Design a protein with these regions (language model features):
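Residue(s) in the substrate-gating loop at a strand-loop-helix junction
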Residues: 126
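Canonical Rossmann dinucleotide-binding motif of NAD(H)/NADP(H)-dependent dehydrogenases/reductases
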Residues: 1-17
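Short C-terminal tail/terminal secondary-structure segment
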Residues: 82, 131, 192-196, 209-210, ...
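Substrate-binding pocket helix/loop in short-chain dehydrogenase/reductase
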Residues: 83-85, 89-94, 190
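Short, small/polar-rich loop/turn modules that mediate ligand/substrate recognition or access, typified
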Residues: 158, 163, 220-222
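A glycine/serine/threonine-rich, flexible loop-to-helix segment
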Residues: 155, 159, 169-194, 204
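Active-site helix of classical SDR
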Residues: 108, 142, 150
Length: 234
């Protein structure tokens, strides 16, 4: 979803900085190519968001390369399926919390000094926040937290003219599912129970991120926008 959103922003005229794990360099440079084909500047910043020092450096590097910061999208997430809470290790739980809760917190803190009135912060929540799956105990917690940080931060930053909103995807095909985020049984039926009868593609919700950042969405803040193919919404 981050890839689709980055490309959508570039095609609407934004210069874009993205973060990626060093092991994902080939994918990152594919995104850079598409951003440049759109006639915009692309900046790829490798590193681990679970480290506070890196989150700070990432923001500073993005500001330096882009000449400022107007939009912050917190999209990175960790999702691992675990059938029983008894089998969930403290290490796995901690990794999910660091990626899904700590990293956005650190990134927002680092970005705030650079965000001027009219800026926007957008978070990726999930339908798991309000309709959690039993095997996603830790992930679902983090997405409920994401919904609430959107609503709380929107109230806090309103007086500064900074809007905060979230996007809550339903069954969207992303690397999360095939890298341990869902069982094979779940993958075989993924998205089939939605009213549309299929999973969505990241490109089908990328425009929501763009609209939430747009100047003509200036009265929209503290909201969570669902994209679930017709199933439960926040």
């Amino acid at each position: 979803m981050g890839r689709a959103a980055a490309i959508a922003f570039a095609r609407e005229g934004a210069d874009v900085a993205i973060n990626y794990f060093p092991s994902e360099e080939e994918d990152a440079w594919q995104v850079m190519t598409l951003i440049k084909e759109a006639g915009r500047t692309g900046v790829a910043i490798p590193g681990d968001l679970r480290e506070q020092s890196f989150c700070r450096k990432m923001v500073e590097d993005a500001v330096a390369e882009l000449g400022g910061l107007d939009i912050l999208v917190n999209n990175a997430a960790r999702q691992q399926s675990c059938e029983s809470v008894a089998d969930l290790t403290a290490e796995d739980f901690d990794a999910t919390m660091k990626t899904n809760i700590y990293a956005p917190f650190w990134t927002v803190q680092a970005a705030l000094p650079h965000l001027k009135p009219g800026s926007a912060i957008i978070a990726t929540a999930s339908e798991q926040a309000y309709d959690p799956s039993p095997e996603l105990y830790d992930y679902a917690q983090t997405k409920a937290a994401t919904m609430n940080y959107v609503k709380s931060l929107a109230k806090q930053l309103a007086k500064r003219g900074i809007r905060v909103n979230g996007v809550a995807p339903g069954p969207i095909w992303t690397p999360l599912q095939v890298s341990g985020g869902a069982s094979m049984e779940k993958l075989e039926k993924f998205g089939s129970q939605s009213p549309l009868g299929r999973p969505g593609q990241p490109a089908e919700l990328a425009s929501i991120y763009v609209q939430l950042a747009a100047a003509d969405a200036s009265y929209t803040t503290g909201n969570i926008y669902g994209a679930g193919g017709g199933q439960g919404q926040p």
